[in-house]
A protein has these predicted regions:
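Catalytic alpha/beta active-site cores
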Residues: 1-180
Length: 180
């Protein structure tokens, strides 16, 4: 690869790469969201930004009584590996940059994503993306935490340690300063 001349200037290869364009989207079912993602990619979108529904964000099964009326309302419902497979069907994850705006259930959803990538034959070092993984925000802003503050740091740290070692092009946490 070409070496930049000075400072942190990009190489020609980096400079010619198109901007990352991701629409925050996800609704109803994994199948419906997949159709939307593939339409957007066909129109020139260069990455994906997954919006999850409230039961998925808070770790509730879609069949749980507290999930009633919320499944698929503000994002896609993902309850298991089969849902994640449907969400990314015919989307080559090794060629995608995927953002998952998810906090409390970030470790679990990242594991499902990596499972689908593995099934597709994508090497971990080819995957690019971001998990918000900001569990402190869940305590301070939303009240959707699964664990008390101190124990919440353990899964956050686990995602950071794992991705920095095994998935080098993944941004393991994206702190959300825009929340009060």
């Amino acid at each position: 690869p070409e070496v930049p001349s000075a400072m942190p200037f990009p190489t020609d290869d980096q400079r010619d790469r198109p901007w990352l364009m991701r629409t925050y989207a996800g609704h109803s079912s994994a199948k419906s969201s997949n159709e939307l993602y593939r339409r957007n990619l066909a129109k020139g979108q260069t990455g994906l930004s997954v919006a999850f529904d409230l039961p998925t964000q808070t770790g509730y099964d879609p069949d749980h009584e507290l999930s009633r009326g919320e499944v698929g309302k503000v994002g896609v419902s993902i309850a298991h590996l089969g849902d994640m497979r449907s969400l990314f069907d015919q989307i080559p994850l090794a060629q995608m940059n995927t953002s998952m705006t998810i906090n409390a259930t970030a470790p679990w959803l990242l594991a499902l994503y990596l499972g689908v990538a593995e099934e597709q034959g994508a090497p971990l070092d080819a995957l690019q993306g971001t998990t918000q993984n900001d569990l402190i925000k869940e305590h301070l802003s939303r009240g959707t935490s699964l664990l008390p503050p101190k124990p919440s740091l353990r899964p956050t740290k686990a995602v950071i340690l794992f991705t920095t070692q095994a998935v080098p092009h993944w941004t393991p946490t994206d702190d959300s300063p825009s929340h009060p």
